[in-house]
Amino acid sequence: MTEVNINVTEIMEALPHRYPFLLVDRVIDIAEDEITAIKNVTINEEFFQGHFPQYPVMPGVLIMEALAQAAGVLELSKPENKGKLVFYAGMDNVKYKKQVTPGDQLVLHAKFIKRRGPIAVVEAEATVDGKLAAKGTLTFALGR
């Protein structure tokens, strides 16, 4: 992989997501079919208002969404996919291993392992301080 520093402005050029649903802050490594990105988790995230006010924990499905968005940055930053959308079509073998709380930095790693036409399968994992927080297999459809 090639070490890079793709900032949030460039991420927003690839992804259609915006606050409060943009869950990728920076890309730090990228290759043809692999990406590593960062999500800095703060107490200011809207989901912490209800999940849970006295014990804020990032919902696991949003960790998986952050991983999906990281994979989306990789796919949508390719010139041939400019102007297209990536639709999250499913997730399998998802495991949550560590709670993610305010102050954590999620390191998001996604690797495309299979493609067939507009459908792609990605192996993804999120870590905090080098410890596995979540992992799973994501399926995408490239569209529009």
Curated annotation (Swiss-Prot):
The active site is at residue 51. Pfam families: FabA (PF07977). Coiled coil: none annotated. Its EC number is 4.2.1.59. It catalyses: a (3R)-hydroxyacyl-[ACP] = a (2E)-enoyl-[ACP] + H2O. It is found in: Cytoplasm. The keyword Transport does not apply. Keywords: Cytoplasm, Lipid A biosynthesis, Lipid biosynthesis, Lipid metabolism, Lyase. SUPFAM superfamilies: Thioesterase/thiol ester dehydrase-isomerase. One of its GO terms (cellular component) is membrane. One of its GO terms (molecular function) is (3R)-hydroxyacyl-[acyl-carrier-protein] dehydratase activity. GO terms for biological process: fatty acid biosynthetic process; lipid A biosynthetic process. Belongs to the thioester dehydratase family. FabZ subfamily. Involved in unsaturated fatty acids biosynthesis. Catalyzes the dehydration of short chain beta-hydroxyacyl-ACPs and long chain saturated and unsaturated beta-hydroxyacyl-ACPs. This is 3-hydroxyacyl-[acyl-carrier-protein] dehydratase FabZ.
